[in-house]
Amino acid sequence: MIPSKMMSANPEEDPLDTFFQYIEDMGMKAYDGLVIQNASDIARENDRLRNETKLAYLKEKNEKRRRQEETIKRIGGEVGRGQDASYAGKHFRMGFMTMPAPQDRLPHPCSSGFTVRSQSLHSVGGTEDDSSCGSRRQPPPKPKRDPSTKLSTSSETVNSTAASKSGRSLERAEGKFTVPASHSPPRASTSGHLFPSPGSQERNIKVSAKPRPHSDEYSKKIPPPKPKRNPNTQLSTSFDETYIKKHVPRRTSLPRDSSLSQVCSPAADPEEEEPVYIEMVGNILRDFRKEEDDQSEAVYEEMKYPIFDDLGHDSKCDFDHHSCSSQCATPTVPDLDFVKSSGPCTPKGLLCDIPPPFPNLLSHRPPLLVFPPAPVHCSPNSDESPLTPLEVTKLPVLENVSYMKQPPGACPSSLPSHGSSHAKDQTGALGPAPGASILSSSPPPPSTLYRTQSPHGYPKSHSTSPSPVSMGRSLTPLSLKRPPPYDAVHSGSLSRSSSSVPHTTPRPVSQDGAKMVNAAVNTYSAAQSGSRSRTPTSPLEELTSLFTSGRSLLRKSSSGRRSKEPAEKSTEELKVRSHSTEPLPKLDSKERGHYGSSSSREPVKAQEWDGTPGPPVVTSRMGRCSVSPTLLAGNHSSEPKVSCKLGRSASTSGVPPPSVTPLRQASDLQQSQVPSSLANRD
């Protein structure tokens, strides 16, 4: 700037100023050029360095690759290109390139199924046959065994010294080949032994374990067998222990197994691996055979012991369980059939035929199942009006002609209305018997089945319990019998009306009940009043009372039945009128006759229910008297007709009687019916 000012001041100085300016500009240009050159040089240098390093890295990489390839090629030449297969995992290119070679040689190896290693071994053997480098030829098998190169190198080094000689001598000792180790067959055999056959392995182990360096590999392999042996021995021992506990004969089988395993394995150490498995397998097979023999112990073990318990139970409580099972309203049709066909003792045998768990369940279940069985036999349809005609027809089947005429006449009016309800109640109270008797042209046999069922099932179940099913069906004969006769007398007129009422179970019994009650009220009012007070409120109480009074009742019932028989016929006729009720009482009396001797409890229940039901109910509590049945029978013969008439009128009137009255009437009716059934039976 100064020069410019000066120039401005002194125009002469302009050339100098311009000169300086020019110099300055040139210097700046040179400087800029240098800077740029420097920068470019620096950049170029950096690029060069970068490229050099990169190239060096690439060169190193390439060199490494080249070396690897060279080594692979060299190894392939020595061991055979099959060896490349082992490297295939590491060096993909070479592996793929060389892979075809081992594949081409696949036919050579004895075991083409082996992995690439085994193939490579065999292929190596083939190549080595061409090249006579014995020391190198032996090592390849080891790499096959262990694909690690270290093993091969170590084997090579060792083999170079004495391994080749020892290997040859060993192979000769084996007797496989006297050919020097350079030949592939011995090598293949040694290498093959590792994989294919335990026998060859044992030989290799024995021969090479001591002199060969391979012994290290063998020793490595040997330890695993030992653990196998130990676990196997433990397994076998635990196996044996568990089975020895269960079956002593197992011990004999174990020695057998050990001997077999020893026989199978000429060389104990190497083959113990397999023998162990063989031993285990043999034991298992033997165990399975034994288990087949003792299926109950193993497969059905759980069921087997329960079965024995059940058998013991049955033998001990023969009568108890069977009376209970048959008595329990659990009456399955088969149960009833059994009882009917084979008598009191047969039910047990038949029950035993059923798989063991079921009889036990039935014996314990009965009180709960009491009600269902009745429904099963008394289908809802059977309870309904359609049964009324069946009942009417059933009366003729019963063959009480004189009274049957009356029931149809008297019942026609009442039967239509309450006939269905009557049938329901009767079927319900009597249990499945009514339906069966109705359906069967010959009521007595089915009734016999059902009678056993009803006396046992109902007394035991004591369907007096208020459950709706029990209300409909389960008014047990006991409950019906027990109510005091004097109540029944009053309800005699109401019985029919009550029967018209759909839910009053006693109605069906009430007709006959009223008749019987009128006859027996005078004689038994006092006794039954006592018994009524005793009538159990709950099924359990009834059961307890039944069992307590059972034995005494059984003794007295036999005499009671005999006394009742003469007069029972008239009562039986009355029972015929009570269509659905009658078949059961008859059956009860029959069954009582059959079962009285066979099972104490069954007869007791049957007698309570059947033979002595009316008064005996009282007497059963009080001690049954043979006289009461006779009196009852006499009363029945004299008064039942009147009571029936009353019952019909009441039913016609449709006056609903108290439920208690129907129950009492039913009880009276059943009482009278039981003697009548006894008479019919006799």
Curated annotation (Swiss-Prot):
Post-translational modification as stated in the protein's UniProt record: Phosphorylated on tyrosine residues by FYN upon stimulation with CNTN5. Phosphorylation begins at 16 dpc and persists in adult brain.
Mutant lacking the gene: phenotype: Triple knockout mice NYAP1/NYAP2/MYO16 are fertile and appear healthy. However, compared to wild-type mice they show a clear reduction in brain size, exhibiting a reduction in the size of the cortex and striatum, but not the olfactory bulb or corpus callosum. The total neurite length of neurons in these mice is also significantly shorter.
Distribution of this protein across tissues and organs: Expressed predominantly in brain where it is present in the neurons, but not in astrocytes or oligodendrites.
Organism domain of life: Eukaryota
Family: Belongs to the NYAP family.
Assembly information from the UniProt record: Interacts with ACOT9, ARHGAP26 and PIK3R2. Interacts with components of the WAVE1 complex, CYFIP1 and NCKAP1; this interaction mediates PI3K-WAVE1 association and actin cytoskeleton remodeling.
UniProt-recorded name of the protein: Neuronal tyrosine-phosphorylated phosphoinositide-3-kinase adapter 2
Gene (name only): Nyap2
